[in-house]
């Protein structure tokens, strides 16, 4: 990846005087990529992480780099329904490439990753409940060092873009 970034830097690109330099933000989950983001980028974007991961990333990244954390959210006060929907949207990551090592590094176990995931991993990765509970999780990421929290509302029912959830969450998050 370091070599690839060097190749990108070697390509002449002149966006003009209004934008003399385009910022670079890397997707990063584990320490080596976070260190690369610190050394060769303006920041990082994490995905499928807990606030504890955000705190670790901030410690590695340092104070002067952008840290954007993703947080899946689901407006549902029913634990069984919330976890069912969350599992539908997240469990496939538990067997996908670099996510299992990242999740293990965050403290989740093979038992948490088994099947469609334990309640512990689902609750750790998806903020569900009412507006206050979800806003609380977003605040946890901010307190852990995130500059920005990218919420990913999980769709329910016929609202495939989760627009209603965004409408309800916006006043508490903006």
Give a label for each model feature.
Residues 1-174:
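Active-site-adjacent structural elements that line small-molecule/cofactor binding pockets in enzymes
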């Amino acid at each position: 990846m370091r070599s690839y970034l060097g190749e990108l830097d070697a390509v002449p690109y002149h966006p003009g005087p209004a934008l003399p330099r385009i910022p670079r933000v890397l997707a990063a989950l584990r320490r080596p990529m976070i260190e690369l983001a610190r050394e060769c980028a303006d920041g990082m974007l994490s995905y499928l992480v807990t606030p504890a991961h955000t705190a670790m990333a901030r410690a590695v990244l340092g104070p002067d780099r952008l840290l954007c954390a993703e947080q899946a959210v689901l407006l549902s006060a029913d634990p069984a329904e919330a976890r069912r929907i969350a599992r539908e949207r997240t469990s496939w990551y538990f067997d996908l490439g670099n996510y299992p090592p990242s999740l293990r590094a965050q403290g989740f176990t093979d038992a948490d990753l088994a099947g469609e995931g334990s309640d512990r991993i689902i609750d750790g990765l998806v903020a569900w409940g009412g507006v206050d509970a979800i806003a609380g999780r977003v605040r946890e990421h901010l307190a852990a060092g995130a500059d920005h929290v990218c919420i990913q509302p999980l769709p329910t029912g016929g609202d495939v873009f989760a627009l209603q959830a965004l409408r309800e969450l916006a006043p508490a998050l903006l």
